[in-house]
UniProtKB/Swiss-Prot annotation:
Gene Ontology CC annotation, any one: small ribosomal subunit
Keywords: Ribonucleoprotein, Ribosomal protein, RNA-binding, rRNA-binding, tRNA-binding
An annotated GO BP: translation
Coiled coil stretches, renumbered: none
Protein name (database record): Small ribosomal subunit protein uS7
NCBIfam families listed in its UniProt record: rpsG_bact
Gene: rpsG
Keyword DNA repair: no
Entries under Gene3D superfamilies matching the protein: Ribosomal protein S7 domain (1.10.455.10)
Origin organism lineage: Bacteria, Bacillati, Cyanobacteriota, Cyanophyceae, Oscillatoriophycideae
Annotated organism of origin: Gloeothece citriformis (strain PCC 7424) (Cyanothece sp. (strain PCC 7424))
Subunit and interaction comment: Part of the 30S ribosomal subunit. Contacts proteins S9 and S11.
Length: 156
């Protein structure tokens, strides 16, 4: 970590098709080995599929999915006198969105199916309907925080 001043956070430009920062963040998460055009094709194909299947605006469905998958609390390990406690902490909005996108992509990759675009489309639709792996992960995170509420006074 830097001992001097905090570095400035670089602004991410919105994506050219939907003019959305969220879509660009997702493209960057899906990208592997610097292949951004492939990642953007995957995202746009997935969103097109979502639009066709739901009959709604795909960006709206995607934003709803991310909102549903965003955790409000998480647990962080805190070492106190030789013991490690799982301390529940509130999640900042930026981190919450990042976690939601990470989980959506992670559970899309682990799904069975032919193409990544199809798997991602299914995961987005499931998350928008409050089901799927990303939602299960958020619920599990909330349960962990609830179970460890007694250690909330160790917050830092």
């Amino acid at each position: 970590m830097s001992r001097r001043k905090n570095i400035k956070k670089r602004p991410i430009p919105p994506d050219p098709v939907y003019n959305s920062y969220l879509i660009n963040m997702t493209i960057r998460r899906v990208m592997r080995s610097g292949k951004k055009s492939l990642a953007s094709n995957i995202i746009y194909d997935a969103l097109k599929t979502v639009g066709e299947r739901t009959g709604r605006d795909p960006l709206e469905v995607f934003e709803q999915a991310v909102k549903n998958a965003t955790p409000l609390v998480e647990v962080k390990a805190r070492r106190v006198g030789g013991a490690t406690y799982q301390v529940p902490m509130e999640v900042r909005p930026g981190r919450g969105t990042t976690l939601a996108l990470r989980w959506l992509i992670q559970f899309s990759r682990s799904r069975s199916g032919r193409t990544m675009a199809g798997k991602l489309a299914n995961e987005i639709m499931d998350a928008a309907n409050e089901t799927g792996g990303a939602i299960k992960k958020r619920e599990e995170t909330h349960r962990m925080a609830e179970a460890n509420k007694a250690f909330a006074h160790y917050r830092y």
